[in-house]
Amino acid sequence: MELLCCEVDPVRRAVPDANLLHDDRVLQNLLTIEERYLPQCSYFKCVQKDIQPYMRRMVATWMLEVCEEQKCEEEVFPLAINYLDRFLAGVPTPKTHLQLLGAVCMFLASKLKETIPLTAEKLCIYTDNSIKPQELLEWELVVLGKLKWNLAAVTPHDFIEHILRKLPQPNEKLSLIRKHAQTFIALCATDFKFAMYPPSMIATGSVGAAICGLQQDEDVSSLTGDALVDLLARITNTDVDCLKACQEQIEVVLLNSLQQYRQDQDGSKSEDELDQASTPTDVRDIDL
């Protein structure tokens, strides 16, 4: 008889280093170097002839779904998108290679941020085996060369803890604000309009949008409106008007995402109604 052990070792993480989080020099260094890792142009206009913005959105959504299903660290997806955009900003790429490029970028980001990284074989399965592990490994070297091995890019997640530490928030609310901000950061990564925004602005706008959204349901902050935006802008040395515009765009992206989700749910419900005669009604009401 074979025994199956279902216990899984917890992911090992270092505890937050107070010396880093409470030293403003760390935040200033991040602000100084963040733009080094941004794509240098809107590559759809001057580099890519075969790839369109909607294709980038489709592969980014697929990458997000893979990262969510594999329970990757929050930093993996935005970092992988950073690699994708930087590569596409410099290398004309046929659309038939876009999913391969996305898989390679997740492969690299996972190696950098995960304790147990994604494997080449697993990523190939997510492409319905349209690419082979050897092909992915070969492209890994291509991408590394084009990025000049500069993989430790600054992402919006690098700023989250520095921002939250400086806000007059009760500790019990910070985890919820953090979770919502991380969701907004992921949504921004799927939309190309945010590709050339500084990571600090996306992080600050995401935190602001998270607090404003939560304030509609409960009191999470003593700051509201312009006072909150002014404080966030001071923390990351961001122009107030630019920050307001960024936060508004983040809220629009969230609204569009929710509307799309509801449409998908309505479409799924309509399909379910077609086979209602063969399925007990109460089964449909169960929320899994």
Curated annotation (Swiss-Prot):
Signal peptide: none annotated. Disulfide bonds: none annotated. Phosphorylation at Thr-279 by MAP kinases is required for ubiquitination and degradation by the DCX(AMBRA1) complex. One of its GO terms (biological process) is positive regulation of G1/S transition of mitotic cell cycle. The modification Phosphothreonine is found at T279. Keywords: Cell cycle, Cell division, Cyclin, Cytoplasm, Membrane, Nucleus, Phosphoprotein, Ubl conjugation. It comes from the Eukaryota. It is found in: Nucleus; Cytoplasm; Nucleus membrane. Residues 264-288 are annotated as: Disordered. One of its GO terms (molecular function) is cyclin-dependent protein serine/threonine kinase regulator activity. CDD domains: CYCLIN_CCND2_rpt1, CYCLIN_CCND2_rpt2. Residues 26-151 form the Cyclin N-terminal domain. One of its GO terms (cellular component) is cytosol. The modification Phosphoserine is found at S270. Belongs to the cyclin family. Cyclin D subfamily. Interacts with either CDK4 or CDK6 protein kinase to form a serine/threonine kinase holoenzyme complex. The cyclin subunit imparts substrate specificity to the complex. Regulatory component of the cyclin D2-CDK4 (DC) complex that phosphorylates and inhibits members of the retinoblastoma (RB) protein family including RB1 and regulates the cell-cycle during G(1)/S transition. Phosphorylation of RB1 allows dissociation of the transcription factor E2F from the RB/E2F complex and the subsequent transcription of E2F target genes which are responsible for the progression through the G(1) phase. Hypophosphorylates RB1 in early G(1) phase. Cyclin D-CDK4 complexes are major integrators of various mitogenenic and antimitogenic signals. This is G1/S-specific cyclin-D2.
